[in-house]
């Protein structure tokens, strides 16, 4: 059953909600906002807890202890999190779109997501190793395939 087609975001249980996250790691990238234009820019500087090989948080259950500023995506705040990439399942479903063809719930694994270049896998640097974050602005996190 494709629960995400049968239920609204508000009707999902915790397990269903968590499974919507494809584990791309894009939400764990540091972002900048231009002071003059208020335009959002993604960087390839990732949270210190992000595993660069597969894009998951190495301390997911305790992430708020290690990174108090980490944002928890919920049904109550997804509308306000406009910085989530267009490829994000939470954002897509909130906006009435389908899950992308490469999503692990569609394909059964993360392999298609990585092959499509839709994750942070091998594309990021740890934020603690970045000196000038402005030098690390990238466009690929904003890319969306379908």
Curated annotation (Swiss-Prot):
Upper lineage:
Bacteria, Pseudomonadati, Pseudomonadota, Gammaproteobacteria, Alteromonadales
Q: Which family does it belong to?
A: Belongs to the UPF0260 family.
By what name is this protein known?
UPF0260 protein Swoo_2117
Q: PANTHER family of this UniProt entry?
A: UPF0260 PROTEIN YCGN
